């Protein structure tokens, strides 16, 4: 899932034209003296600010990564006030940096999300915690989420949610102008699906997101999720002193998080009461059978504020990864019917005859084209286009020594669109993951991160995506909206469609 959502927007990437990415690493040889930050090329502060604030750069930070490589090479530096950021956009250098990490890697030292927790006296969850607290939470949650068999435990729960999604897509067809099979703004529908799925896993309860009438508090939560990423991007782009003069983004961010915490608290308290009631007089194994994730947190006797902080942040993280990736996947499959046909055949063979069969999590994970489609979509549209690190010691990146406590941004969008790694990098070609052509560098596409800071919900997200794609393509042929122009991505802290994706879901 979105393991570093709050920090991706610190990716201050700039510059002009966007040609090829295959810039030389500029190695000067092993006997050359290491170079300092002062030797790293980069834009002047006025150019950077103009690109960011006057030319719409905040919504196209991912494109500015590509342009930065073209102008400066794989490493460049930009300054914003007292903050200096080093950008790294070559897979070999990203690997070099990540393999120098300590036991508790730190990300950006400034986070408006963590500041909200401090001001509201809320506990940090896995997304906002740092240091020993982050390590403790990571160790606690890893066995519950990272192991493949742990994610597979929730397959039955997710299967029910997926079937409700199929029913909702049928209901949403033909609303408004256009063909009778057209569903407008599929990302909005998949937002509801993402929240329903992660809530079922976390809380063991259904929220009604996929019903004909969505509960008002659920609608408020969904709106807050979309809004908080916009306000995060604006807040992190502004120096702290400017927040007092332009309070709007910070105020919206706090209101959004307050809504999300209130929503989560309501459901956590309800589940806690139900667990306590059910556990009276029952053996422990009966209570825990098929239990939701929050139940295990109760069993660990985690303090109530910490449970609430983690559930709130995991609800947020579980929405965007699934909703955006599923939207892009069906968008690309609708524009590449030959791939969709091949994938439908693969899924049908696994399902067996009849459209109501349910493949196991293990069976889905063994479908090569299905896995390749998900990987290719995440290469083209990584949920988090850039990641950040703050090294706790001096490190070497290529020819440069990066001092400790320097903000470093890893430009994942740029490396995943590098033609030296991926021929025809802007084309949707799942076959590239099935042995077609040379294999890319393993750090060229890192949609879930790497190492101790990798996405905690990766297994769950992959399972949810595979199950949703399998059932949707079993029931529907997905076709593009007639006459629609191509949809491009934009940065909203995470990568999202710049406008609504409308698709036709034609019964098979």
Q: For each of these PLM feature ranges, what is it?
A:
Residues 2-17, 79-86, 149-160, 170-200, ...:
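Cytochrome P450
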Residues 28-56, 60-153, 157, 186, ...:
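Cytochrome P450 substrate-recognition site 1
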Residues 51-73, 262, 266, 357-398, ...:
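Conserved cytochrome P450 K-helix E-x-x-R motif and the immediately C-terminal K′/meander segment
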Residues 122-124, 317, 435-465, 489-492:
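Cytochrome P450 heme-thiolate "Cys pocket" and heme-binding signature region
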Residues 146-147, 231, 255-326, 356, ...:
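Conserved cytochrome P450 catalytic core segment spanning the I/J/K helices
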Residues 194, 198, 203, 260-264, ...:
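Central I-helix of cytochrome P450 enzymes
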Residues 337-339, 441, 458-496:
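Cytochrome P450 heme-binding "Cys pocket" and the immediately downstream C-terminal segment
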Residues 410-437:
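Conserved cytochrome P450 K-helix/beta-meander segment immediately N-terminal to the heme-binding cysteine loop
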